[in-house]
Amino acid sequence: MEDQKTTNQVNLIQLHSLKWVDDELAMIQDQYSATLSAINFPCYTQSSSKTKDYLVVVDGKVYGMVREINCGNRFEYRALMADGNYIEPVSDIFHASAIDAVCELARRHHDNEFANQLTDYVIAVSQVQELASAQLRKNTKYLLSEHF
């Protein structure tokens, strides 16, 4: 009976210690809400069964398109100019999120302030995800050490 009580307490501590993630992400969302609300994806076309092209409009100005490619267990995103030509990403790899591709389009349109705001948003979210992942690894290690 004592072992079960200890396990339940550990699980509560683990869940409680990750509550900060939701709070942090909500603060980031609030901080960047004006930037994010400027982006519209008013329509898309289905290019193939695994590809969708989304029109990107920022503050009423057409920036181009974002191509979403379904790779089975993940999606890749590419920025396209309005004429359909790809913009090669700076890193030479496809983007893991549509926001990164929109950032690429913003830079192409010399909207560096907007691109920098999007980059800051992506970095802030990534940092929270990394910290949460580290906390989960720590909790898992702790739970495993308690039982084995």
PLM segments and residue spans:
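Short aromatic-glycine-(Arg/Gly/Cys) micro-motifs in beta-strand/loop hairpins
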Residues: L55, V62-E88
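Negatively charged, low-complexity tracts enriched in Asp/Glu with abundant Ser/Thr
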Residues: E2-V58
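A short, exposed loop/beta-hairpin motif centered on an aromatic-Gly-Thr core
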Residues: A82-D100
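Generic short amphipathic/hydrophobic targeting helices enriched at N-termini
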Residues: T6-Q9, S17, H95-A98, L118, ...
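A contiguous, mid-protein "functional segment" used to position or interact
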Residues: F94-L118
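Short, mixed-charge low-complexity intrinsically disordered segments
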Residues: A115-H147
